[in-house]
Regions:
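N-terminal leader/targeting segments and the immediate start of mature chains
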Residues: 2-11, 18, 22-79, 144, ...
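Short, surface-exposed beta-strand-loop junctions and turns on beta-sheet-rich folds
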Residues: 88-90, 109-111, 186-187, 278-279, ...
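Acidic/charged, solvent-exposed loop-and-adjacent secondary-structure segments enriched in E/D, K/R, S/T
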Residues: 103-125
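Gly/Pro-enriched, hydrophobic low-complexity segments
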Residues: 148-214
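Short, solvent-exposed recognition patches
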Residues: 216-299, 313
Length: 324
């Protein structure tokens, strides 16, 4: 993983989805023919994403620029295969073979990471456990709509508190695949959008699987950060449901220790960095880029930086309630 200075530069250059396209809602309040509850429909969505053979062409609205990508997914012999391909500009591929994900980019050497799924460009809610999230989120049916010439059911995923963002998802009535997701802030401003414009399913593994099986693996890259002993600082306040997933220790180019801890509630994530390096006071403050918030503050002669998918007010409270 990138060290903190590099990570901040990367995130500041990164883009996020924030514009809504063709957001017309049909005045059809009827629920799906199979009469699933909102929570059952969300569970059916995550199951369909993992168990069907399918291919999607979808659009990301990236800082006002639309980018089209193709995603293909298949199961064969109980192994997962997937491929994400850019359809505009320079061709880039991400290929999954079971628990290995390889990146192919003409500008850098190809490499492989150990992962259970491709995380790039896909909404994180596809990997969520909605039975667990029901304790902290409300799931509400919003009626029917039409996406990619398919009838869909709309469901709002809204936190029970006001410390997180919320989603509106559009789920295909027949296959239960996700065809659109809108990530919104507390005021309903669109931060991020995933929108399918064409898709197909198959009863058998898709043809791309055969070529993927023959493709040599690029070198495997491991996380070189250490899970070493960190300082005794702790977060005195967190929104309900968030818990620490891991912690690491590394050093920057100047030899300063950088401790990090990663937190998730199962839908949204953030990471806290505590560094011994001296930060310019002018760099304190917040930056929101799409759904990603960066909040920095100097405390106890240390740099504290939070990076994650949280409202600025929530990020500020978490950092300011940190205790050494």
């Amino acid at each position: 993983m990138l060290e903190l200075p590099q990570m901040l530069k990367t995130l500041q250059k990164s883009t996020a989805l924030f514009a809504c396209i063709f957001g017309f809602v049909l005045a059809e309040p009827a629920w799906a023919a199979d009469d699933l509850s909102p929570q059952q429909l969300l569970n059916a969505m995550t199951q369909a994403e993992r168990q069907l053979n399918y291919q999607l062409i979808f659009v990301q609205n990236d800082n006002g620029n639309n980018h089209a990508l193709q995603y293909r997914y298949s199961l064969k012999d109980n192994k997962k295969y997937a491929q994400m391909t850019t359809m505009d500009g320079v061709k880039r591929d991400i290929i999954q073979r079971d628990d290995m994900v390889s990146y192919f980019n003409p500008h850098i050497a190809p490499f492989t990471l150990k992962s259970q799924y491709i995380v790039d460009n896909l909404p994180p809610l596809l990997q969520a456990d909605f039975d667990k999230l029901a304790k902290y989120y409300d799931f509400t049916a919003l009626g029917r709509n039409r996406i990619a010439d398919r009838m869909v059911q709309m469901v709002r995923i809204k936190p029970k508190d006001n410390f997180r963002y919320h989603y509106v998802v559009f789920i295909d009535e027949e296959t239960h695949l996700l065809l659109r997701s809108d990530l919104l802030d507390q005021d309903g401003v669109l931060l991020d959008q995933f929108r399918v414009i064409q898709f197909a399913t198959s009863e058998t593994p898709l043809p791309f699987v055969e070529s993927v099986e023959q493709l040599p693996f690029p070198p495997l890259i491991s996380d070189k950060r250490k899970a070493g002993k960190t300082s005794n600082w702790k977060l005195s306040w967190l929104p309900q449901g968030f818990r620490q997933m891991n912690k690491t220790l590394t050093t920057d180019e100047e030899g300063n220790r950088i401790e990090s801890r990663f937190y998730s509630d199962g839908l949204f994530t953030f990471e806290i960095f505590v560094s011994d390096g001296q930060q310019n006071e002018a760099q304190n403050g917040s930056l929101r880029h799409g759904a990603t918030t960066i909040y920095s503050e100097t405390m106890n002669n240390k740099e504290i930086t939070l990076i994650g998918q949280l409202p600025i007010g929530t990020a500020k409270r978490i950092v300011q309630d940190l205790k050494f």
